[in-house]
Every structure is written in C-alpha cells, then in structure tokens.
C-alpha cells in the first residue's frame, strides 16, 4: 500500500515502499533512479516524476555538498535516520504511525519499518564509527528512544550545516551536545526533577581518600569535584533519591562521536568505548551500593543536587 506524502507545493502524492527506501539513500543517483519504463512514462506526465523526486530529495537531504569521500567521513547511517524521520513528517498524519524506527533484538542494527516491513537498516558499529569487535551494553527502552532522538539531531545538523563535516567533523559533536533540545531530553531521562538552568551549589563537604577512589569511575579514573558528577543522573522516589550513570553508548554519542575516517580513529574510538566508558560503567554498577551511599550524602548536603562547583568552577551539568 503506497504512503501518501505532502511536501512543498505537492499534496497527497503517493509513493511506494521501494521508492521510500531509495529516497533514504544520501546518494542522489541511487535515490532518484528510475527504470527505463518509468522514464518513458515520465515523457507523457504533466507533472514529471523526476522533478518531484528531486524536490523531495532536496527537502530530505539538503543541498548537495562535497563528496563524502573527499571529506573522509561516513555519515550514511545518520543521514538515513534523518531521512526516515523527514519522510514520516511528510506523510499524512493518519499514516505516520506506519513508520517505525527501532533497534533489532540484539541492539546491533537500527531498523526502518513501514507497515511492519523492514525497508532499510544500518549497522550500529558503522553508525558510531567503531570496529565490529566493540561490545555494546544493553540499553533500556527509554535509553533506546533517547539514542535515536540524538541521532535524528545529528542528521538534522548534517543536513542543515554541512560545513560541520569539515576539519575531521570536530565541530559536529559540539553542535549536537550543546543543542537545547538534546539537553532537555537528556535531563528528562536522567535528572527529571532538576532544572538544568539552575545555579550551581558551592562544594562544602569532605571526602576520605577511600571515598575519592570509589568515585573515580564516575570520571574516567580521575577525581575533581568540578567535573565528578557530569555522568550521574538522579531522581526522587517516595522520599528516597536514586542514582544511575548515563549509559556508555549515550555518553559516547554525546561526548566522543566523530564520523571521520581518518587514520586510526576507528581504533581509538573503540578503545575509548571499551577501555574507558564501558569500564567506568561496569565499575560503577559493581560498586553501586557503596558509591550511591557516598553520592547520597553529598546530594543531601548540597541542597539535593550534584550540580556542584568549587571556587565558582563547575562542569557538573549532565553530560
């Protein structure tokens, strides 16, 4: 059954599943491909299909930019996620629930479905620019949702501001990480009871060396009050405060993701994921009871927050 789209000055334009799958491709030639018979029929159409598809392609993917090979980046996955989201938005409201983007059972692929049928997919290792031997921790459903929202924002930034891909794409991550919509979503998941624009609270506590060592896994093996709690979420429940660490896959996506294919970067990304982010997460979970007890004392003695500064310096805003 075709999907009905409305875009530009086109209304109720019907497109089948195979064409929607093609339109998700950032490769313009592939996206706009028409067979011999289709091209022949286009000669007799009042409104040329080729022209309509070009308009839709531009709306989805943005203006043409330099070849990805020249920029030495791999952003195909992010572009597909953005394209699928755009196609869903152009679909008539009554048909938008036919579009579903989700993870597979093993959380190694993002699947794009229409009417329950997979029309395309992207590999998570390639999407995050890490090697195939990189191990991902299992995400909960709400973490999956946040992951996809962040990826949609990456795709949006790439489409609107292709200049962010220049210079090894170093500015792309910052553009997403500093986006207000992304910050709001991260806080909604991990610090739902806290106003992210609140004033920080000055450090007024003391910690033993043993306690400091326990907290090192919160900050990649180091300890500094001004940055120690930026990966820790918390929320109140029935008079108790609960803590958790931002999932390592989300931390990587927000803090470290770079699509550049420059020499050794994939290996470096993989080492960061495995040897730092996953390790910190495991260390926290394995010592959660003792660490949470320390965090609870700090939280309660600092006006129920870990947004703590020292000598007016603070980097403890969540991620």
UniProtKB/Swiss-Prot annotation:
Q: Which GO terms fall under biological process for this protein?
A: protein secretion by the type III secretion system
**Can the keyword Membrane be found in this entry's annotation?**
yes
InterPro entries documented for this protein: SopD
User: What induces or represses its expression, per the UniProt entry?
Assistant: Transcription is induced inside host cells and is dependent on the SsrA/SsrB and PhoP/PhoQ two-component systems. Highly expressed in host macrophages and when grown in an acidic environment.
Where the record places motif Required to target late endocytic compartments is 37-44
What is the name of this protein? Answer: Secreted effector protein sopD2
Job description of the protein: Effector proteins function to alter host cell physiology and promote bacterial survival in host tissues. Contributes to the formation of Salmonella-induced filaments (Sifs) in infected epithelial cells and to replication in macrophages.
Domain comment, as recorded? The N-terminal domain mediates secretion by SPI-2 T3SS and targeting of late endocytic compartments in host cells.
Q: Which organism is it from?
A: Salmonella typhimurium (strain LT2 / SGSC1412 / ATCC 700720)
**NCBIfam families from the UniProt entry:** PRK15380.1 (NF011907)
Q: What is reported when this gene is inactivated? A: Mutation leads to a prolonged survival of infected mice. Deletion blocks Sifs formation at an intermediate stage, before fusion of late endosome compartments with the SCV, and impairs bacterial replication in mouse macrophages but not in human epithelial cells.
Name the family the entry cites. Belongs to the SopD family.
- List GO terms (cellular component aspect): extracellular region; host cell membrane; host cell plasma membrane; membrane
Keywords of this entry: Host cell membrane, Host membrane, Membrane, Secreted, Virulence
Q: Where in the cell is it found?
A: Secreted; Host cell membrane
